[in-house]
Amino acid sequence: MISITEKVHGTSGISAYVLCKHPRSFANKAIAWISEKLLGLEIEGTTQYYHDYDYLYSSRSVIKNQYYNKNAGPGFYGCDVWKFADDVVRPWLQKGMTAYYEIVGFLPNGGYIQKGYDYGCIPPKEGDVYQHGVHFKVLVYRITMTNVDGNVHEFSAREVQQWCDFVNLTPVHQYYYGYAMDLYPELSLAEHWNENFLQKLANESLFYMEQDSPTCNNKVPHEGVVIKVENMKSEAFKLKCFKFLDKEGKALDKGESNIEDAN
């Protein structure tokens, strides 16, 4: 089974409600030491720290909570768009849950998250309250659940769609869910099926390949699709449109920066 979803051009964000390492206060250290050393009681963690559930949020590679990462700054554009996205997702997280998503549209300062890619959003004007669904959108594409032993359960693509529907969040748009061979039944499994499948998928008009973005008001190239294999693992593959790659290459040649490169 596979899932094929829209690949959107934004910035990655992660929100989690997971076990975190907390330093003990001086009084708590003393209590823990007495409990363990003098009374022979088993304590959670060590005399120096303990574990408890807490909320974390991050970009693709940088934890943004300043009490966990003292070096965390406002990021590439001088504003913490990840905190606004976390405010949208955080209320729905259960203990052990981590949500992965793309943030698209505009920044609080009115600039694009990714130049030209509005995804139906409008830029906030001076004095406007930065609003989800108006100025920016959060599109969830992956969810995991981690138990107290550190074992991770990967939500299926269908479960991601169902969970988002249940809590009124927005998942990435799903184009197809089913068996790969059923998408193009005319292809022979015995004759270079993998190559032929990818060639047809790369030009699939139903998925807007090599067309303009179907979800942006601006005329910009559709980025492509993400193919996720339903095998209880985090196994997904990106198939980008050549028109998008050409546009991205020209931007790099001009020296234009990218929010993803800095976060």
Predicted regions and their residues:
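Core nucleotide-handling region used for phosphoryl-transfer chemistry
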Residues: 1-263
